[in-house]
Amino acid sequence: MPEQQNKSIVLASRPIGEPIADNFRLETTSIPEVKDGQVLIKILYLSLDPYMRGRMSAAKSYAEPVAIDEVMPAETAGVVVESKSSQYAVGDYVCCRSGWQEYFVSNQKDPMTYKVDPETVPLSTYLGVCGMPGRTAYFGLKREGKPVAGETLVVSAASGAVGSVVGQIGKKLGLHVVGIAGGSKKCAYVKDELGFDECVDYKAIDLDGALKAACPKGIDIYFESVGGAVTEAVSKQFNPGARAPICGYIASYNATDITKERTPFHIFGELETPPEHKFFLVFDHYAEFAEANSALTKWVADGEIKYQETMVEGLERAPEYFSWLFSGKNFGKLVVKIADE
């Protein structure tokens, strides 16, 4: 095929606090030649997720930091436009970890590149409810949360990509599910559309009182994604034997020095009877991904699990859109449309 140009966004400098435009740079380069066993993927949708903020920092973490001048990492969905692989044909739809760019050359042996079917569910959902956020919810609750029917589950960031799925799976498992979200619109969506039993607005004047009213039997499982004041309120109402899977704590991600932040580990550790808690990674359960993928896709296709997307357009504006994750401007899964087919 004729030589094409590829636009990408790289990390230009490490953010101090909230990332700004100058921390990123748009670059244009030639697309590498596709070699035997490789495919060229045209990226159609880009997923923006909170974990990316941690990768921008040089601080020690569960994953290596993004190098300066390296393409920002991300899960994406696209279509194969050139193939020198016996496993992929032109026109195949795939998910991959291309990062913030328009085209990606993938090796056929890359386990993070795999076929998906946009006839079953919309292609963009493979980046959300049927993708990494959905799998995080599935394993975070079923494996880390160890749910028992009749227990009370509290879900932070309940209208978000992960939390919304956690709560809906919780209802399937017979739990009393209470969400925590920001604002009346999101709370109404969580309760009326997603089917949570209750939803507490974390902006409420009396968060402790509102949470206690929603959880009259105390809290058995807390799915942690936020940290801060929300976690402080939840921690006062744990039952003995409670579990708290920690997916993240977005309230601290833009701190100038996260080592000085009061994290869920500090809050839980100070309790007389701390809940069972740990930071988990979805890749801890990689061997079971097929199980989660099958279940989530079927539930979405059958209308048993609902989802919300904020769909925006333009690779060049990805840094701006990324900031929405921390201001609450997005509603549900934040996806950037990169190109038409």
Predicted feature locations:
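Short, glycine/polar-rich helix-capping loops at beta-to-alpha or helix-loop-helix junctions
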Residues: 101-102, 182-192, 260-267
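Short glycine/proline-centered loop/turn elements that form peptide/ligand docking sites
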Residues: 83-87, 179-189, 203, 207, ...
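Mid-domain Rossmann-like dinucleotide-binding core that forms the NAD(H)/NADP(H) cofactor-binding site
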Residues: 127-205
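NAD(P)H dinucleotide-binding glycine-rich loop of Rossmann-like/cofactor-binding domains
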Residues: 72-79, 87-157, 304
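C-terminal hydrophobic helical "lid"/dimerization subdomain
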Residues: 2-4, 286-341
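Glycine-rich beta-strand-centered segment in the early N-terminal region that forms part
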Residues: 30-48, 56-100
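Short amphipathic alpha-helix with an adjacent loop that forms part of the alpha/beta core around
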Residues: 206-217
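Glycine-rich phosphate-binding loop and adjacent beta-alpha segment
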Residues: 229-305, 339-341
